[in-house]
């Protein structure tokens, strides 16, 4: 029997392969696959259920229906293996050959393959250089095409209608040849000489002038070359023989009641065969042309439907009016072969159930219902029962398990011990969505989950379900235990912070324990150690919050690595002393000697992990959880209506705001402010009123007055339950409490604009009908958004995974000196991210020197850990160059040094780590979370009240960055440049804060002045945009004609008149071409120039501009000539966020992108055209000047005669990533995308490490455009993989030839995924038809380099534990093959097996 098994194993071993090639099948190849021709459309006999002969299920062609048994039953059993029955002609073999044997249909007339015809760009069309319309007319028999013009005036490929053809026949007789249908196209394709075509086009290319024509020729050249190099012949795009799928892949199953369930393919094949047979008969009968033509057209259409139903014309429908599923539909889409069966499979040994809390479990455990465990571990139990001799056979064991005899439970306990199971919660958004636990058997039917891992799973216990999977093999168990165990996944791979931090009840319990209460029972006592404090608490002498003195013992590790104990007395509370009991040895008492909110607990765990390692942290986390639950129970915190204390100041604040609004309303009615300004100001008033109310409310809630020991009144932090929940971070936020006890505030309409009347009531007071109605808008919008955005976010994740899936760490060090320059991130004045956080876990690219010296502080290639970061901070270094995956030089992967620290493990990354997938998950996972978290604040509009000044937080010196300014009559600076920033520098020269200041800002201080903290140093009006003059003089109106380009509005109250410029659209025809502007003139009427230039001082006025001065009025420097009202802003919420991230990663061009200077030089304006200005930049070195047409309505940041640098902003707008890459280089575009993406996530309080975004950017930058081909094979203007070009260039340089030059190109993630080298990966992502068509024509072969391709072909992935397997295979392939001893062929094995079995058979 053993031998027998050996043979079976040998038989099933597939041949090893290194790649998969796709190409066009020639008719001969199709025939060689085939085991016979299918001639009849019959399937199976409805009475006998036997397949019909020569039909679609014929046993003779495709193989027997039953194992080792022919159709008529003459030969049965294994001993007749390989015999072909002389009666029914069926070979006696296994029935599984019906899954692999193909048939064929000989078509009576050739048929075009619809993919090469209709999938754009049409390959047949490109090949013949004809339009798709024309080819279709030929194929569907509407017109003739000339094939052989002979000596006539016709041309090859010319289209002739029926009449033209008859005329030509009369004129030329049979001198020429014209046909219609696929035969004609076949002959045209056959006549193409590929080599000659390539030569002709290569010669023609340099002389072509028109851009479109050149593009077309290049396209065609690429196609013809692809055919030539791949060895495909163009005529193979036309089918003469149609392959027939093996019958078991298009099954037909009899249902009861004489009906059949069948695959749609059978219908489609039947149609083809019927029409084909009819056509054959018609041809034999020599039927009239018109009938034959119609039949041929129908044959063409039926083959089209079989290959890709619905691509041309109406889809063929089945009996139930739904389109039939064609071969193309089988492989594409979510339900297609790729995504349904190859990339996602169903797994056995799994179960699912509802989850509940397991507060008593350890971190590495989960509670598994006994019933489930019994089912999941059945085979193990059977084996154990037999092994122990409790059951003699498997059958007996089965019976025992079914009866659930007591021994079975003992065996189950034994089987389960140390056998991890994997728990998974859908949706699995990141790798922490599947973790391994040791099962603990429990009664009941719900799986128990440890509370601390809920955050990673994003699970809650409101009915969530989870699936259990059992790793079977020893290797699988080992991997589950060492890599996936929940205790090994304490840090999040997205940001390297603990992911098992306590939340909710636990936080509340710990917070409650660590609070102090003035004059609590036992205040002022002193204890000799923590145990004594505990005794006092247990006996009721001192309460939990009493302030006491305790002597504590701390353990610390000194430099020599010895443990040193120190004792000291601390002022603390009884509760904190109790907490210190569970603190692991080696952590400082100060970590718990504070109010333990969620942030503090997270920091505590992080410190514990970094200082003491994994094991201690896991034990500590569990202890924290048990303690937290215990004290949360004891605290008795609850929510009552009286806890929501409404502040007394609320009513006066609301009344004040209402008065202000009335005042503005009056101003509006008297025409002092415009409607837009009024709306904005009203909303600002209410926003700030809301802020004040909520401040008052929080102040009221957070403090309470108590009597201390000396009998005096004292303020202490309140023990109000709601305040404690919010303050500790357990549940709720200030915004939510504001709605409960303050005022609900401003609401948004469904379109996102803010309703100007706020809800002044709160939930405690209750809402009246109108208030309730307004608030339903926001709530409903939130819910609708959530549903839509979850889908969007999932799609974003899928695209990210797809673009990054093949990026793996494959070498130690690529040796590059390049990297990204890191600086602290400063935004809105605050340091959002200090340098240490940005460089932590990175590798230094170039030596960092001590400031002001030549001493090397941090040498190159140092991995910066916490200790190094402290050194960097102490030396106040504010920028350094660190290695990044974007600048990594490794081909087809990245190196360890460029990636740096593995965030989830805390040491440098290992080889074989799939960093691409981790990056995609880290970015995609919060996306989904964010999308699901819009509506929790009930749609309350959170809009920052518009900023109108800069108030500094630190003292220091004022510095201005790229700012132009003028000094006004009061001696103050007025900013007249667009993207100016002011920074505060401390005495060490470190930047402390940085602010963007808009055009028109008035500064209270001069540059290099000292400023004190809290000073307001800059002011501006946020609602209007001024136009400021840079010279003094009197003003002169140009093109300002009342009723034509402007109107006068007089204020009834003040009698002042103001001038409003009309939009171009509102002007009468006379004013369309006019350009209203203000020119400044000197006293003598001569034009004034802008200082330092030869440009006259004239200011164009855009539409809606309001001028408050009259013609010839005098004006000073720095005064406003006009003001332009700004529109109101919509609410910002992640809705803007998620699409924003998608836009960045898709590298989409914004609607009105910023215009950047293409070259460095001097600005001037050329001749104007209708609606556009001509901007000219003349380089200083006298090179070619650059011109650009800019629409007149764009606000320019530059004036005539100014100097600009390449890549500087000329006109404001959103910057397009492609422009940044082209003009400022890779590092700038990387910084731009990283910062923009981070802004969106930071707004939501989500932390993601920059590395992950950089990984995606690296994948977006993998392609380049060849500028000059040098001596390489590439074509100029061709897109190629950067790594390919680099490898080719290295070879060329080694031979002393000219390398190719290239420009990097930025592709969006979808485009980048589709442009990968691997066609399998691209086809399984999107646009399957197009990808496969392109790959087949080029005869591409897939080297199976990425993860996805390997999953699809069913191999281990070349990452993680599968990495070494692929390494070994590569090494084996590199060595010459050693001849194997007595290798045995499959046929020999089969023969031996048959002999063995015959022997066995003759004995019984």
From Swiss-Prot:
Keyword annotations of the record: DNA-directed RNA polymerase, Magnesium, Metal-binding, Nucleotidyltransferase, Transcription, Transferase, Zinc
Which annotated residues bind Zn(2+) 1?
70, 72, 85, 88
Looking up NCBIfam families in the UniProt record yields: rpoC_TIGR (TIGR02386)
Please report the organism this UniProt entry assigns to the protein: Shewanella halifaxensis (strain HAW-EB4)
Stored SUPFAM superfamilies: beta and beta-prime subunits of DNA dependent RNA-polymerase
Q: Which of this chain's residues are annotated to bind Zn(2+) 2?
A: 814, 888, 895, 898
Residues the entry annotates as binding Mg(2+): 460, 462, 464
Q: Which family does it belong to?
A: Belongs to the RNA polymerase beta' chain family.
What taxonomic lineage is listed for the species of origin?
Bacteria, Pseudomonadati, Pseudomonadota, Gammaproteobacteria, Alteromonadales
Q: What name goes with this protein?
A: DNA-directed RNA polymerase subunit beta'
Task: Fetch the SMART domains from UniProt.
Answer: RPOLA_N
Reactions catalysed, semicolon-separated, are: RNA(n) + a ribonucleoside 5'-triphosphate = RNA(n+1) + diphosphate
User: Which terms in the Gene Ontology molecular function aspect does this entry carry?
Assistant: DNA binding; DNA-directed RNA polymerase activity; magnesium ion binding; zinc ion binding
Biological process terms from the Gene Ontology for this record are: DNA-templated transcription
What InterPro entries would the database entry show? DNA-dir_RpoC_beta_prime, DNA-dir_RpoC_beta_prime_bact, RNA_pol_asu, RNA_pol_N, RNA_pol_Rpb1_1, RNA_pol_Rpb1_3, RNA_pol_Rpb1_3_sf, RNA_pol_Rpb1_4
Outline the subunit composition. Answer: The RNAP catalytic core consists of 2 alpha, 1 beta, 1 beta' and 1 omega subunit. When a sigma factor is associated with the core the holoenzyme is formed, which can initiate transcription.
Task: Pull one GO CC term from this UniProt entry.
Answer: DNA-directed RNA polymerase complex
Give the cofactor binding note.
Answer: Binds 1 Mg(2+) ion per subunit.
Q: Which cofactor does it need?
A: Mg(2+); Zn(2+)
Stated role:
DNA-dependent RNA polymerase catalyzes the transcription of DNA into RNA using the four ribonucleoside triphosphates as substrates.
Q: What is its EC number?
A: 2.7.7.6
EC primary class = transferase
